[in-house]
């Protein structure tokens, strides 16, 4: 667990309001929309990202890109949150249980160490590899100060 200063890295995303019940079955479809666009765009692409603006949740699903771009339908230019953030890494193939455990660990660490969270959080997924045990997913929670 650590505190880092993050920068507003550009992303290509689909923004959506959903429910926590629907989310596990929907994120793949939204990510597919983004990658369908990225395959035809002249953009450098990076890792997959998911940003949760609040507990509704209002989400942004997409990927890092090298620069801002003109929006295309539901795929819009955005940025990862910038500022001080508490972070940890979930290791191994991503699973709902593993990602949830990483979020809980950040929350508990922040509460134990007096760091107030804004509610904005995000995940950055490592590039896929043949050996899933080497996969890492970074989990961030933006702090109030």
PLM features: what roles do these ranges have?
Residues 1-145:
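A solvent-exposed interaction/effector surface
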């Amino acid at each position: 667990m650590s505190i880092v200063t993050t920068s507003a890295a550009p992303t290509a995303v689909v923004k959506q309001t959903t429910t926590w019940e629907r989310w596990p079955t929907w994120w793949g479809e939204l990510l597919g929309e983004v990658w369908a666009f990225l395959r035809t765009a002249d953009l450098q692409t990076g890792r997959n990202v998911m940003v949760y603006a609040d507990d509704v949740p209002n989400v942004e699903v997409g990927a890092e890109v090298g620069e801002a771009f003109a929006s295309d339908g539901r795929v819009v230019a955005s940025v990862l949150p910038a500022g001080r953030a508490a972070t940890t890494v979930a290791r191994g193939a991503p699973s709902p249980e593993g990602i949830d455990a990483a979020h809980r660990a950040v929350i508990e660490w922040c509460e134990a160490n007096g760091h107030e969270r804004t509610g904005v959080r995000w995940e950055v997924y490592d590039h896929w590899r043949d050996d899933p045990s080497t996969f890492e997913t970074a989990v961030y929670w933006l702090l109030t100060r």
